[in-house]
């Protein structure tokens, strides 16, 4: 089995739209979204290598020093699957973007380190 890093992507526009929802509607969506996310985790437990977590603010370290930056990454999970396609299919209809205001999930293979 190969390992894949899945990054949850969100946009400021989607979050702003979410925040404009009526509080009662938003709370109902949060409750159903949390349940759906837990159900997704249970259904895919055999594929999940690392449950991951939400991500906080970003710092960039470079030859120019350390700076604050913004990106669209909101969380991650590591899964295992036979192929890149199979890993991506795990996230079809994921609550991150079907219930919550997430934009998408980007999935990339974790490649082995080169060397002896």
Task: Show which residues each predicted segment covers.
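Conserved, structured core segments of small domains
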Residues: 1-116
